[in-house]
A protein has these predicted regions:
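Active-site beta-alpha turn of Rossmann-fold NAD(P)-dependent dehydrogenases/reductases
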Residues: 9-12, 69-71, 137
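Active-site proximal helix/loop that lines the substrate pocket
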Residues: 13-16, 72-78, 126, 141
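NAD(P)-dependent short-chain dehydrogenase/reductase
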Residues: 22-24, 55-109, 114-123, 150-153
Length: 209
């Protein structure tokens, strides 16, 4: 506002959508349920609030601000100690150890390659509409946690490791199973297209871990 910027992008998240009941494409205008009493809800609730502030500044002060709702993003540069499930699977492939899931791995989400996320951000910054949000993902990567583990074990580790679901896994620290298939037609209308599948992303990731 004070610096008279030409444009800014707020990096939001697909977690903003909360719990979606349907296994169908979800557009930017659709939102699911977030339990305000769940302590983990602080993250998606904060994303919703920040997007609202961006929209308010765009409307009241004409600040050119755009929101991108990123799917889980990964590629070269991820730390070897990263705690996220995709990184854990990459480590297991490198170490030749079985992938142990504490849940059944039924949650389904899309992903996007890091470099593609960057091009999406610039696409929105240069061609998007101020105050609006844009989903960013590669629909071809949409799969369950278990399915992703099978891909890593069979294609990345060449069948040398297995995916095992723990019989007595501690599921208390994990979110309830969910599905979230992002509709990216809005950003595609700006000319952006996703390119890289999960196998390609994993191969690139592992080379740099």
């Amino acid at each position: 506002k004070e610096k008279k910027i030409k444009g800014m992008v707020y990096l939001s998240s697909m977690e903003l959508y909360g719990k979606i009941e349907k296994d169908e494409f979800v557009s930017e205008s659709e939102l699911g349920y977030i339990d305000p009493l769940n302590i983990r809800s602080c993250y998606p609730e904060s994303k919703r609030m920040c997007e609202n502030l961006c929209a308010c500044y765009a409307a009241e002060y004409e600040v050119p601000v755009y929101q991108v709702r990123l799917a889980q993003t990964f590629g070269p540069g991820i730390s070897y100690e990263d705690k996220r499930v995709f990184a854990m699977m990459a480590r297991k492939a490198i170490e030749g150890k079985d992938i142990i899931l504490q849940t059944k791995g039924t949650s389904k989400h899309p992903y996007v390659y890091t470099a593609q996320a960057v091009t999406a951000i610039f696409t929105v910054l240069l061609g998007g509409k101020s105050g609006e949000a844009y989903n960013v993902s590669n629909p071809e990567t949409y799969c369950s946690i278990y399915e992703m583990g099978k891909l890593v074990s069979e294609k990345v580790a060449n069948g040398k490791i297995k995916v095992i679901v723990a019989k007595n896994g501690d599921i208390s620290k994990y979110p309830v199973p969910s599905c979230l298939k992002l509709d990216i037609s809005k950003i595609e209308n700006l000319g952006w297209k996703p390119e890289h599948n999960l196998l390609w992303m994993y191969n690139r990731l592992i080379k740099t871990m």
